[in-house]
Amino acid sequence: MSKLISKQGKRPALSQSGLAKPSTSKKSSASKNANTETAKLLTKALHPRNVHKYGYDFAALSKTLPALTPFVGPNAYGNISIDFANPDAVKQLNAALLLHHYSIRDWDIPHGYLCPPIPGRVDYLHYLADLLSAPHKGKANRNIRALDIGTGANGIYPLLGIESYSWQFVASDIDKVSLDNVDEILAKNPQLAAKLSLRLQLNPKAIFNGVIEKDEYFDVSLCNPPFHRSLADANAGTQRKLSNLAKNRGQSQQQAVQAKVALNFGGQKAELWCEGGEAAFLANMISESKGFAAQCLWFTSLVSKSENLKPCYAQLAKQGTSEVKTIEMHQGNKITRILAWSYLSLSQRQAWAKLRDQSR
């Protein structure tokens, strides 16, 4: 695992601002309003800064990475594409996208690990940049320090965040194989290594505990939590995705059901499911975040199931958050939500940003 540790976030002394003691009073009108009327920001397509918003240029991608060429051809509708149910095709597409748009070389993942869709992953980062008051044009603030919870073998959020915004990242995972693979990617891309620190989470039931160190500060945390409650649920979800892809290719439902599970829709246990599923994971994350209220400006997570939002709002209100936001990202027919919360008041967040820019 890489020993290159990114610069530890240091928060300057703020004896007058109260930043170290975020307001948690239930009587605070700002806190009450933030928790009872969650801000909801709606988008209809990929983020305006997303370079993938117009689709894939397979000719250019194949030129950048010739290994993609054998997988490119007309689909059932006569459009140039790849077979998205073919794990090798999807992996080569990702490698081509990362090389062509982000100058990331030799990206790869071990057999059976999750292969993420690049456009949706980078969308999350663009909206986080907006959340952190980054400019809407050009490069965003380069002083941002981010924490990726459950980075996986693909390490996709830190890789994209470093190349898109030059952010500093700490990435954690409970799976050593995943972190070892990200470390191999860093070895092939030295421009990334100085900005990314990898940390093994030794307690599979913990999220922030054991990862965030004393006197360490982050501008934002991000996470794509496990979705399913069990391996059986995960496999059923995989079969549904394969069935939908088969319909798009004109294959029969029976052919789809007989398709081999996993691979590009695969993933190890920690990537796809946990006891209690997404709802339980989010509840644990929110609970732990309280203990680091003054060490992270914004906590965020993706939320796939809309029904999981209401209990999150209730829990966040009880914990005295100052601000809660929900950002809906529309990617084709899929809607994914970013849930973001902060324990710091508006004035504290403004002081944080000002001191961050002055001190790093």
UniProtKB/Swiss-Prot annotation:
Comp. bias intervals (Low complexity): 23-36
Subcellular location(s) of the protein: Cytoplasm
Chain residue ranges for the region called Disordered: 1-36
Pfam families in alphabetical order: Methyltransf_10 (PF05971)
GO CC terms of this entry: cytoplasm
One of the GO biological process terms: rRNA base methylation
EC annotation from Swiss-Prot or TrEMBL: 2.1.1.181
Top EC class, one word: transferase
SUPFAM superfamilies: S-adenosyl-L-methionine-dependent methyltransferases (SSF53335)
CDD domains membership: AdoMet_MTases
Key words, A-Z: Cytoplasm, Methyltransferase, rRNA processing, S-adenosyl-L-methionine, Transferase
Top-level taxon of origin: Bacteria
UniProt-recorded Gene Ontology molecular function terms: 23S rRNA (adenine(1618)-N(6))-methyltransferase activity
Family (UniProt): Belongs to the methyltransferase superfamily. METTL16/RlmF family.
Function: Specifically methylates the adenine in position 1618 of 23S rRNA.
NCBIfam families linked: PRK11727.1
Name recorded for this polypeptide: Ribosomal RNA large subunit methyltransferase F
Organism, as annotated: Shewanella denitrificans (strain OS217 / ATCC BAA-1090 / DSM 15013)
